[in-house]
Amino acid sequence: MRLKFLHLHLHGLIRSKNLELGRDADTGGQTQYVLELVKSLANTSEVDQVDLVTRLINDPKVDKEYSQKEEFVEPGVRILRFKFGPNQYLRKELLWPYLDHFTESLISYYKKNKKPNFIHAHYADAGYVGVKLSKYLKVPLIFTGHSLGREKKRKLIDTGLTTNQIEKLYSIRKRIEAEEKTLKSADIVVTSTNQESVIQYSQYSSFSPHKAKVIPPGVDHKKFHHFHSTTETAEIDNMMKPFLKDSTKPPLLTISRAVRRKNIPSLIEAYGRSEKLKRKTNLILILGCRESTSKLDPQQKDVFHNIFETIDKYNLYGKVAYPKKHLPSQIPALYRWAASRGGVFVNPALTEPFGLTLLEASSCGLPIISTNDGGPKEIRSKCENGLLVDVTNIDELKVILEKGISNNNQWKIWSRNGIEGVNRHFSWNTHVRNYLSVLSEEFSSSNSYSSSDIKQSCLKGTSSLIKPH
């Protein structure tokens, strides 16, 4: 019998195409990760159906697609949306009071429909629901934290925020409690790097190291490649023209959400302190899409205020670009455009569980300069595609940025290494092959679950994993 998966991804905005990455603090790399994972799983011979369950949102401020109860993604994959809480779109910190009602709705649904063989919960909120649902349905629970509350709290305290401020902004206590309960109940904890399991998850008393399985995510190599066209180059040039005096200079490109953790003001500060960088490069900030900063949530407003203040402090007009809008299809083009001009991709985040944008950039031939926190260490060790830096030290960040654009021969080595390294180590086919192998190893000989179809499906192995096209 072929397997059925249920993936829980409750916050942010997710749909089958045209993801609004960077629109807000809740719609970022995790959203893309989950969508790519469910599509890749469905494209295997072992898997019959993958359901991605998320929140139904009926809010005029967001697209109508998010109010569809069911959305077809591709054969074997669908998005199911359940209403919980008010109609309007809410940030994840405000969803906690409604999760019990959502759990009851899911239980009612599966009383009438075929239950999954596995539940995979993404982030603490989904973990909270996944624990209760897996116990009721008596099926295994897989958990991916994506980012963890204890690690986030530690880094925010380092920036000067108090525990009370952090609690008010992020409901961090509820999140950590949910993570502890999920780690206790989960059968498998999927991490992207060894650093996650050894350092980040080990901060939790409920974490059992033997449950952790390191399965790095992949890159869509059809989108993220190093063959650029004159058409897309001209398109990106036009995007930058309103901002830059000379768009031919090597760009320092960053792509992220406008949230505190991403540490964008520090990047601008380092750039502003360097006469060399201001003379020789441009700084490109792709921070999601916005109509007006006045319509953003409080955290984003604060981040943009700091960004504009720092740009003004160093009079960086004509050297820094911060477009209000971009299309999802333009992200790969931005990487290739930056590479064609001898630029680098910069990730200045305070914490980085993995760093999917680093893989995307490298796959497009763009070297990286990244935070030395978390996943980037392992990406660089496998790819040798750039430099790492302590981003809390502004002067060190300045020096490393200068070094990144100083040696053309070294730049070419990093660029080539990145392309080859990502192709070798990071693909979604490899990810799902490892993912299903882990399930086979964990459950084919386990007596923890009596459901024979799980064991039989896993015993098949993954020898002919990918469906023929």
Indicate residue ranges for each PLM-predicted region:
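Catalytic cores of nucleotide-sugar-dependent glycosyltransferases that transfer UDP/GDP/TDP-activated
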Residues: 1-469
